[in-house]
UniProtKB/Swiss-Prot annotation:
It is found in: Cytoplasm. It comes from Pseudomonas paraeruginosa (strain DSM 24068 / PA7). Keywords: Amino-acid biosynthesis, ATP-binding, Cytoplasm, Histidine biosynthesis, Hydrolase, Nucleotide-binding. This is Phosphoribosyl-ATP pyrophosphatase. One of its GO terms (cellular component) is cytoplasm. The gene is hisE. HAMAP family: HisE. It comes from the Bacteria. SUPFAM superfamilies: all-alpha NTP pyrophosphatases.
């Protein structure tokens, strides 16, 4: 796992039980999962809009900024649910080299 991701995961974990007025992340945890999910949804939409704008203009700076926000809030969501980013990295590693079609077929229940 990257040093940045490791450090961020540690900070998020520290702030799970911090006073809500001590940081933005602590306030999100205090507001609960629904507020965190709302932020993930908001950042998802902003990322999509930034991608459309980047495709039209060729300028990807806003796309990078919004993607960072989306990743950040997704990490807050995982942490709120007791999950570590390493679990996502492990899942991506598991899928590496596996055909997307084969992976999807393996997930689908038999009819």
């Amino acid at each position: 796992m990257s040093d940045t991701l490791t450090r961020l995961a540690a900070v998020l974990e520290e702030r799970r039980n911090a006073a809500p007025d001590s940081s933005y992340v602590a306030s999100l945890y205090h507001k609960g999962l629904n507020k965190i999910l709302e932020k993930v949804g908001e950042e998802s939409v902003e990322t999509i809009i930034a991608a459309k704008d980047a495709a039209a203009s060729g300028d990807c700076q806003e796309l990078i900024y919004e993607t960072a926000d989306l990743w950040f809030h997704s990490l807050v969501m995982l942490s709120a649910l007791g999950q570590h980013p390493q679990a996502v990295l492990d899942e991506l590693e598991r899928r590496f080299g596996l055909s997307g079609h084969a992976e999807k077929a393996a997930r689908q229940p038999s009819a």
